[in-house]
């Protein structure tokens, strides 16, 4: 039986990611560019600012600000006290970021972040999966502003997270249902890359390290056999399907599922929440035994409790 899920309306469409800040408040960004904060104690939700783009992944920065991965505008830093925004990065090697998606931040302020596609923007995310462009990338930005490409040719690079020991960075490949692991060297640079978890039962989106030390993974949709078959088809066929009417393209199923893994990739939790009022989980944060969820399509965030916590 699906687990109960509490829905929290947000004044904006597509609350894609969620972030719990040290004060316990829950932040999210919506498709209209707005950044909102919800107070679980009072139940109040406030719109703080707008980026002028499409905010996706959110992350705590060591200086108390909030990192915003804006699909249109790149990496931004939000001061929650003043609601001011600073642009940290818009391009890499002279090429503007087309689909800045998600990030993880180490204690020294180094930002590891994903760019999902060099071909399609967030509004055409489905086109990238159908065409199987494999143009996703993982980057590393040091506090002095230097940026290096860590991985490329990823199949829709998506969620990024640190392991509990901070000895590796993980990045989800939505198109291949895989999570890759990049070892961190003693000096904080990227080492070898390996597959951490593969053959997931669905397409992963955002991932995050929880307060329980586990890596939480959203399963945005169960494995789509049509999409899997299509990705093996000739390029011309993929292009033809991309141009079909939206109703004829492969689409996510209406589920609300998250999984949690330990530091070596062993499954610890597989939670299937009630999706009758809320679905398509794309963002996740575990905090004190509660799982907060964001959705690319819902004008709401949601939460449920981890059984046994």
Task: Name every feature range the model reports, one short phrase each.
Residues 1-309:
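Sequence-structural signature of mature extracellular/luminal beta-sheet repeat domains
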């Amino acid at each position: 039986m699906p687990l109960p899920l509490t829905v929290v309306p947000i004044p904006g469409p597509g609350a894609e990611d969620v972030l719990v800040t040290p004060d316990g408040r829950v932040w999210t960004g919506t498709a209209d560019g707005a950044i909102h904060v919800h107070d679980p104690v009072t139940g109040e939700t406030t719109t703080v600012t707008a980026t002028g783009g499409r905010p996706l992944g959110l992350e705590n920065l060591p200086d108390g600000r909030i990192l915003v991965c804006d699909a249109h505008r790149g990496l931004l830093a939000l001061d929650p006290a003043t609601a001011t925004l600073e642009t940290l990065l818009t391009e890499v090697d002279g090429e503007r970021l087309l689909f800045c998606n998600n990030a993880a931040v180490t204690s020294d302020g180094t930002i590891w972040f994903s760019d999902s596609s060099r071909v399609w923007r967030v509004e055409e995310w489905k086109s990238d999966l159908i065409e199987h462009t494999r143009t996703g990338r993982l980057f590393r930005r040091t506090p002095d502003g230097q940026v290096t490409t860590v991985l490329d040719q990823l199949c829709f690079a998506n969620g990024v997270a640190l392991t509990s020991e901070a000895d590796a960075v993980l990045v989800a490949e939505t198109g291949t249902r895989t999570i890759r692991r990049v070892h961190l060297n003693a000096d904080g640079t990227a080492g070898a890359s390996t597959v951490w978890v593969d053959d997931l039962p669905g397409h992963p989106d955002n991932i995050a390290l929880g307060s329980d030390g586990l890596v939480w993974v959203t399963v945005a949709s169960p494995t789509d056999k049509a999409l899997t078959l299509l990705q093996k088809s000739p390029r011309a066929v993929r292009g033809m399907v991309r141009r079909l009417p939206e109703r004829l393209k492969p689409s996510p199923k209406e589920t609300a599922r998250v999984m949690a893994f330990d530091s070596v990739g062993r499954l610890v939790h597989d939670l299937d929440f009630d999706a009758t009022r809320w679905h398509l989980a794309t963002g996740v944060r575990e905090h004190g035994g509660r799982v907060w969820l964001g959705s690319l399509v819902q004008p709401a965030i949601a939460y449920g409790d981890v059984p046994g916590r």
